[in-house]
Amino acid sequence: MKKLTALMIALGFAGVTQAATISGTVEVDITENSSNDYISTESIKFDIAGDSGVAFGSIKVETNASDQFVLDEYSIGANITETASVSYGEQSDIFIGGGLEVVGSNTIANPSDAGESIIANIGALSLRGKFTDTDTDISDFDTIQAKWTTSVDKFSVGASVDHTIATDDNIYAGSVAFAVNESANLSTVVTHDASQTDEVAYESILSLGSLSAYVDGDEADWSKNVGAGYKSTWKDLGYYVEANYNLDSEEVTPAAGVSVSF
């Protein structure tokens, strides 16, 4: 609550709230748990975002498992130039990822993004420093991330690294995407994590409009999982249906969800 109040005050002084946009969604997701039972997860999310041209900020509030409203993410920052900005808050990481709405991202590395951080964007380069604990020492960083992306004609390429300061460990990721046409896209993410037994892993996704399909694996088994999903909207209603199939265990993991935006 203290962080939420402080952020609202900061946004007000920055003039961001004068042009704030408030949006929300009601979501219902159906997934299969470890006991092979289908469970339903309901959530309500609110997003308040504003940009005064110089200062910007956002607040995301959602319901938890106890049906309590909690602060999910927040950020406040400044646009230094047209291509450079800096922000602080509980923000998502910048590491290259994959997967669909729920399924996917089975084999590729996915460093934890939990915690407050500072993010700087300078053109095609993004830098993120995640704090260990801002309540005890705001000068102590846990991890440093960097990401670079660019596009050439129909190709988009990217590279990122996650560095853990205490252990000096690095996790690397690279991506390439090819826009076949306006509705078809083929992308591949490759990661390297020396802390894993199988250090190199990949995921390739083919998207055709609302339909997506993927295959993934690692250096021990280059074809571990396949999956597919369909995601679309109808007026203010969004919905998705997808499933993952493990080629070794022959286990199917389905997921589905609907959301209403307001």
Residue ranges and their predicted role:
Residues 1-22:
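Gram-negative bacterial Sec-dependent N-terminal signal peptides
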Residues 21-28, 39-134, 140, 149:
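Outer membrane beta-barrel
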Residues 22, 53-58, 82-86, 123-129, ...:
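Repeated loop/turn-to-beta-strand initiation elements of outer-membrane beta-barrel proteins
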Residues 26-30, 59-63, 88-90, 127-133, ...:
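Transmembrane beta-barrel strands of outer-membrane/channel proteins
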Residues 32-38, 63-64, 76, 106-108, ...:
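Outer-membrane beta-barrel proteins
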Residues 36-44, 68-74, 110-116, 123, ...:
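Residues that define the transmembrane beta-barrel architecture of outer-membrane proteins
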Residues 124, 137-225:
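Detector for outer-membrane/organellar transmembrane beta-barrel domains
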Residues 150, 176, 204, 228, ...:
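Outer-membrane beta-barrel "beta-signal"
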